[in-house]
Structures are given as C-alpha cells and as structure tokens.
From Swiss-Prot:
InterPro entries xref list: Pyridox_Oxase (IPR000659), Pyridox_Oxase_CS (IPR019740), Pyridox_Oxase_N (IPR011576), Pyridoxamine_oxidase_dimer_C (IPR019576), Split_barrel_FMN-bd (IPR012349)
A Pfam family per the record: PNP_phzG_C
Name of the protein this chain belongs to: Pyridoxine/pyridoxamine 5'-phosphate oxidase
Cofactor section: FMN
Species assigned in the record: Pseudomonas aeruginosa (strain UCBPP-PA14)
Note on how the cofactor is bound: Binds 1 FMN per subunit.
Coiled coil: none
Length: 215
C-alpha cells in the first residue's frame, strides 16, 4: 500500500442539510437527492447503485451492491433470483437495509425496513425490458450455487440460448422483484471537521417524524 490508511481522509465542504430546507416527506427529499446524483455523478458511477444488507437464519449479516430499479410511495424496488443467497435470507428474515453513497455530492442515504415480493406482473414488466442477454442469464445462472468453472456457466448459457432460439424467454418463476418498505430513512450530508448533518426520518402514526442526529 502506497499510503497509510490512517492518513487517508478528505474534508467535506460542498453543502449543508438543514431542517428549514428539508421536506417533511423523506421520499421527496430522496427524489431531490437522486436527481442531483443523476446530474452530478458521471459514468462509470451508477447513481442507482446501492449496498443491500440482509441477515441469514443464523443472524449473520451479508451485503452486496445492487441497482435500484423502482421507487414509489410504497418503497424501493430491486430485482434478483429468488433462489439466490439474498433471496433465501429474505425468506428467512424479510427485513433489510439499503445504503446509497454519492461521493461527488458528499451525500449518503440509509434506509431500513421490511421487504415484500412485488407482484408477478411487476416482475414480468421489468423482465421484459431487460436486454436479451440479461433475460437469458436469469434462466441460465444458478445464482449463488457452486459451479465447477467458467466453462460450466457458458455451457448453461448456450443450453438456454438453444432452448429459447425460437421464442422470447419468459420471466422465470424463480426471478423477480422485492420492495423494501421503509420504516427509517436517514440523510447524511458531509460537513467540515466531521461535523456532518444527519436528518433521521421514522414512520410514526401513519406519517413521518424527523430528528437531527449528532454526527
């Protein structure tokens, strides 16, 4: 390593987050911040990339990077193989957390809540707009299972391509979406001297409460 980890740091000076400028609805603030990220972040950065954390039946946490593919007043939607490790973990414990980090804006959003499957119709609607290779991959890959080597995966894909040579692939039953129904959404804005701004929204009595947290 060319630089000591202890010496790696930066000052956050771009912006602030005040209660006066923050809407009472966290979904409105998330949309504002997401739109800012789309305008500011540049490829190869993906503004809809997020860390998804789940917990298995033994209480061990697991996290990985996914892409947000839907947002409405109900919650935040992502898609995956239901038989994958994350799918099995969500079946055992249907709660999860998401984190979005937009470094160019010095912003982070943390979301916690319960998780439900979206309807088959919603899964199919998204599946049908995916690139053909991704649709075939959803059939070919036994996600999270041990395979012998890369050649085995390529053989599985070739078999799938032959299977659907004369017809478009349909959405597999083992693949689809989840929606995280937020109970808590925290917005973090980097500030100088590590005195960051943190606004914490929580579900309460059919609406949302909002509090400032110490950094």
């Amino acid at each position: 390593m060319t630089q000591s980890l202890a010496d790696m740091r930066r000052e956050y000076t771009r912006d602030g987050l005040s209660e006066a400028n923050a809407p009472s609805d966290p979904f409105s603030l998330f949309r504002q911040w997401f739109d800012d990220a789309v305008k500011t972040e540049r490829l190869p950065v993906e503004p809809n990339a997020m860390t998804l954390a789940t917990v298995d039946a033994d209480g061990y946490p697991h996290c990985r990077i996914l892409l947000l593919k839907g947002l409405d007043e109900r919650g935040f939607t992502f898609f995956t193989n239901y038989e994958s490790a994350k799918g099995r973990q969500l079946a055992a414990n249907p709660r999860a957390a998401m984190t979005f980090f937009w470094p160019a804006l010095e912003r982070q959003v943390r979301i916690e809540g319960s998780v439900e499957k979206v309807t088959p119709e919603e899964s199919d609607a998204y599946y049908q707009v995916r690139p053909l290779g991704s649709r075939l991959g959803a059939w070919a890959s036994p996600q999270s299972r041990v395979i012998a080597d890369r050649a085995e995966l390529e053989r599985l894909l070739a078999d799938t391509e032959r299977r659907f040579a004369d017809q478009p692939p349909s959405c597999p039953e083992h693949w689809g979406g989840y929606r995280l129904l937020p109970q808590r959404i925290e917005f973090w804005q980097g500030r100088p001297s590590r005195l960051h701004d943190r606004l914490d929204y929580r579900r309460q009595d059919g609406g949302w409460s909002r509090e400032r947290l110490a950094p």
